Curated annotation (Swiss-Prot):
This is NADH-ubiquinone oxidoreductase chain 6. It is found in: Mitochondrion inner membrane. It catalyses: a ubiquinone + NADH + 5 H(+)(in) = a ubiquinol + NAD(+) + 4 H(+)(out). GO terms for biological process: mitochondrial electron transport, NADH to ubiquinone; mitochondrial respiratory chain complex I assembly. It comes from Phoca vitulina. GO terms for cellular component: mitochondrial inner membrane. Its EC number is 7.1.1.2. InterPro entries: ComplexI_Subunit6, NADH_UbQ/plastoQ_OxRdtase_su6, Nuo/plastoQ_OxRdtase_6_NuoJ. Gene3D superfamilies: NADH-ubiquinone/plastoquinone oxidoreductase chain 6, subunit NuoJ (1.20.120.1200). GO terms for molecular function: NADH dehydrogenase (ubiquinone) activity.
Length: 175
């Protein structure tokens, strides 16, 4: 049952990216990005990453709502263009959906998905050796590594997000 849920969430994830790539108006593009972010958090949650899914949902989608709230307020259109108002945009959306459908049918026909990345074992994922303690949580080690080894990464990421918001606000404000 969980495999089907992940498969359906993956299809919704890719279809939402097709909808974003053929966006006719920034309002709908932001909405589709928010939906795809929420579905991506659901996929992470289904694989057991409860903390990571929650953090991505709060930080990424919170930032997305703020950025698209500002840009939508500054660059609002009286009659926004939808997917069916232009034949070229509708054609791009339908072609993207058909290619996703064909890919899904190809995967279901072969009943297997090849893994691109191969790891020798659990040792490639583990940062600290826990000995013979049995069960351990990977999330706690990832959070510890992020805030101990990745302090500069957190600072640079926060600074680039702030710069991105300021650039987007300046571009959409115009003259």
């Amino acid at each position: 049952m969980m495999t089907y849920i992940v498969f359906i969430l993956s299809i919704i994830f890719v279809v939402s990216f097709v909808g974003f790539s053929s966006k006719p108006s920034p309002i709908y593009g932001g909405l589709v990005l928010i939906i795809s972010g929420a579905v991506g958090c659901g996929i992470v949650l289904s694989f057991g990453g409860s903390f990571l899914g929650l953090m991505v949902f709060l930080i990424y989608l919170g930032g997305m709502l703020v950025v698209f709230g500002y840009t939508t307020a500054m660059a609002i259109e009286q009659y926004p263009e939808v997917w069916v108002s232009n034949k070229a945009v509708l054609g791009a959306f339908v072609m993207g959906l058909l290619s996703e459908l064909l890919l899904a049918c190809y995967i279901l026909k072969d009943d297997e998905v090849d893994v691109v990345f191969e790891f020798n074992g659990m040792g490639d994922w583990v940062i600290y050796d826990t000995g013979d303690s049995g069960f351990f949580s990977e999330e706690a080690m990832g959070i510890a590594a992020l805030y101990s080894y990745g302090t500069w990464l957190v600072i640079v990421t926060g600074w680039s997000l702030l710069t991105g918001v300021l650039v987007i606000m300046e571009v959409t404000r115009g003259n």
